[in-house]
Amino acid sequence: MTAVSPAGTPGAPPRVPVSTYRLQLGPDLTFDDAARQVPYLASLGVTHLYLSPVLQAAPGSTHGYDVVDHTRISDELGGREGLGRLAAAARGAGLGMVLDVVPNHMAVPTPAWHNRALWSVLEEGSDSPYARWFDVDWSAGEGAVLMPVLGARLGDVLAAGELVLDEVEVPGTPGPRRVLRYYDHVFPVRAGTEDLPLAELVERQHYRLAYWRVGDEELNYRRFFDVGSLVAVRVEDEEVFDATHALVLDLVTSGVVDGLRIDHPDGLADPAQYLQRLADRTDGAWVVVEKILAGEEQVPPDWATVGTTGYDVAWRLQQLFVDPGGRSGLDAVMTRLTGAPPGGLGALVEEAKREVVAGPLYAEVHRLTDLAAAVCHDDPRLRDHTWRGLHQCLRELLVAFDRYRAYVVPGTPPRHEAVRAVEEAAERARAYLDPQRAETLAVVVDLVLGREVGSAGRRREARRDELVVRFQQVCGAVTAKGVEDTAFYRWTELVSLCEVGGEPDRFSLGVHDWHAFAQRFAALTPHALTAGSTHDTKRGEDTRAALGVLSEDAGAWSRLVDEVRAATAPYRGVLVDGLAENLLWQTVAGTWLPDAVTPDDAPDGTSEAAIAPDRLVDYLRKALREAKVATSWTSPDEAYEEAVAELARRALADPAVTGAFARWAREHREELRAASLGITLTRLTAPGVADVYQGAESYAPTLVDPDNRRPVDVDDLTERLARLDGGAPARTLADEKLLVTARALRVR
């Protein structure tokens, strides 16, 4: 790798970033591509590049969070040499680098051999030297890891001849190997079983091939939320930590990287222990965590981190620019279209979390109940608490929990905040349980808090400790899937409020509340990130700003919705529901380009200001599948989705519709300008480390991934910034935002 100067030498960037610029590396943005952007980013005024994950990911990965090899820098991005060239270019311009790290999980790739650690476990089972890496319940699977990858039940797959014994070259192993092949899926064959009849051979492996729908009910390895293709890694084991972090730690200690962003710490068994290890091995490098805080929740004080990645800033800034006076008007539109009552978000969240614990996360809740039942069965004083009763109590406690998790470390007294969070959730859960379950609920609360309960001489301490940890891990998954990834896609009062970590039921934030938050931020986490857009936000900051304008003239918005509904009535299919409609119209408004050609300017009545039809259709399909009302990822309703897509495409081609939105944009341009520039300047002058997401230094009304990962035209940004720096006037809102961003970053 090209040698670079370590942080702290003359001319090196500051150890703590002043500002960062997030780059989403991938096939369209390699290390060398990023290096070519360095002169522009230096002129923009940032101090550090903020890179998405760079370790070797699964074939075809577009984001890097599906790591398969912790010992290699991604070949597709340019390998170690490419990263060295980028680091040298950055240092030459006085910029540092921050790296995104994914400790919680690895990919279950196709073919599986790309993840050599997992391949070894599939081949050798619990005897594999890598068995300790993964969070597998070997007893539940009768010594086999469940692999739910089949498109039909195993018997049907065997009968159809779709599962075959093959011989292939497996990278990293000598000579051809016998494998089981199911289309693109390839699995190792256990030694000594190669010559068995196929059906018997399948049964003798250290993995169990199964129909994909079995995964949500019987999966015996912990995964990232409900994503079966991402298997959890046990970094709480120091040997596993060392093996999976050696390369990252070397990049930090050698000065190639100055800081780290830790992905999904709430999935880890002991986040505090993990962060302390990082701090010890990196001499206290700057580390931020992707921690989603609920309300006034703070990062636990024993975490060795400067703070979060900034979701708490992003949603508050959005609400600061929302007019509380517009709520009743927007409520009326939502109710008219969807039937959802004003103030009904709480019930919607509860409903969604119940669906999650009974559906995609049933296997995790079942495993949690098995643990609790084993603890109780082993203790005569607890034995009469039944599996069913424990399951009911755990289910209701998970649904009632109002944050991602309580941080309880086995063997240590729980913190006051953790006790309060669990006990308040139990109080809410009690209302949904038979009174006869009260004692069982009390036992569950004591168990998940790690308190003494049952016999004085407890046995199977390991199970009790595991229960404490696993409850917290499941809590985070239930909250994420139930709230962010379900309820927030169903609630359409003002969709920009349904942001990661957000509180849509608050609707707006007063100036006094913002200043109180900023003062607390400056006092407690002055070096944490302040984000506007991220790769995980549901909408980009400018999309949210544009949608906030709806609250400033809710009456006019209501009339516009009536107008476009009347215009589209002749071709709006009967399958299209109010949820899809309200989402559609708000998305068109939020992504409208304020300075592009409108129907009034175009002779054919078309509009360059409207979102491209394919972008809109792709987004609506994803959002409606996430909502899981009329369609979903696991049970897609193609007729419904096509009806919504047809409405979206025809609406964008209808001059009556685009004309109405163009009029709205003209009449509310100053409100949009104030919101976009106001949010930008407020954030860039607030306490913390200012983060700019790629392309968001200019006006960029993006949507959820993959829309927000589209390539950025850096040549255009470079030319425009040079023109503005030369004294040319800003021609558009995009120019104004670029100018404000650059001036603020340079002042910092």
Q: Which role does the model predict for each range below?
A:
Residues T47, D258, A690:
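Short acidic/polar active-site loop segments enriched in Thr and Asp
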Residues L398-R405, V483, H527-T543, L584-L593, ...:
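Conserved phosphate/anionic-ligand binding catalytic regions in large, soluble enzymes, centered on
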Residues D715-R748:
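Catalytic cores of secreted or luminal carbohydrate-active enzymes
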Residues E124-H185, R460-A522, V657-T658, R666-R673, ...:
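Extended, Lys/Arg-enriched charged tracts that mediate electrostatic binding to polyanionic substrates
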Residues T2-D216, R222, S254, H264-D331:
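Acidic/aromatic-lined carbohydrate-recognition and catalytic surfaces
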Residues A426-A431, R437-V448, E452-D465, A528-A531, ...:
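Extended, charge-enriched "interface" segments that sit outside catalytic cores
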Residues P271, Q276, A285, V313-P380, ...:
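Polyanionic (Asp/Glu-rich) segments that form extended negatively charged tracts
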Residues P174-V248, L330-E364, T534:
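Active-site cores of enzymes that catalyze phosphoryl transfer or operate on phosphate-rich substrates
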